[in-house]
Amino acid sequence: MQATAQVQTPVVGRHVYGELYGVDESLLKDEERLRRIVIEAAHIANMHLVEVNSWKFKGGDKEGVSVIALVLESHIAIHTWPVYNFATVDVYTCGEHSDPMAAFRYIVSQLNPKRFTVNYSDRSYK
């Protein structure tokens, strides 16, 4: 009897996230537009959309919108604080053929911040 070697595929995890400053307040309140931006970002990044949920929060400095897309490869999230013209973006993928940086760049291009930060973390199993 011959033993067969099992080849394990490593977990490929890439996380791109950042903060966007100086974004137009009305855009940060527009739940439907933010949903469309996240959906298009998933397509651009070659991610497979499973579901998108969003919530609009009211109440002073806590007012804002959160959009979270569950993708087969992981998730995309935007959280906004319109009173501060501020948003955070989180794109995580464990898919070898998806491009989280492309999704992040698209979201930034659509939100058009005055400035932004971007961070990258390799979260792969090694």
From Swiss-Prot:
Its cofactor is pyruvate. The keyword Lyase applies. Binds 1 pyruvoyl group covalently per subunit. One of its GO terms (cellular component) is cytosol. It catalyses: L-arginine + H(+) = agmatine + CO2. InterPro entries: AdoMetDC_fam_prok (IPR003826), ArgDC (IPR027549), S-AdoMet_deCO2ase_core (IPR016067), S-AdoMet_deCOase_pro-enz (IPR017716). The modification Pyruvic acid (Ser) is found at S74. GO terms for biological process: arginine catabolic process; polyamine biosynthetic process. Pathway: Amine and polyamine biosynthesis; agmatine biosynthesis; agmatine from L-arginine: step 1/1. Is synthesized initially as an inactive proenzyme. Formation of the active enzyme involves a self-maturation process in which the active site pyruvoyl group is generated from an internal serine residue via an autocatalytic post-translational modification. Two non-identical subunits are generated from the proenzyme in this reaction, and the pyruvate is formed at the N-terminus of the alpha chain, which is derived from the carboxyl end of the proenzyme. The record marks E73, S74 as: Cleavage (non-hydrolytic). Keywords: Autocatalytic cleavage, Decarboxylase, Lyase, Polyamine biosynthesis, Pyruvate, Schiff base, Zymogen. Its EC number is 4.1.1.19. It holds the Pfam family AdoMet_dc. The active site is at S74, H79, C94. HAMAP family: AdoMetDC_1, ArgDC. Heterooctamer of four alpha and four beta chains arranged as a tetramer of alpha/beta heterodimers. Specifically catalyzes the decarboxylation of L-arginine to agmatine. Has no S-adenosylmethionine decarboxylase (AdoMetDC) activity. PANTHER family: S-ADENOSYLMETHIONINE DECARBOXYLASE PROENZYME. This is Arginine decarboxylase proenzyme. The lineage of its organism: Archaea, Thermoproteota, Thermoprotei, Thermoproteales, Thermoproteaceae.
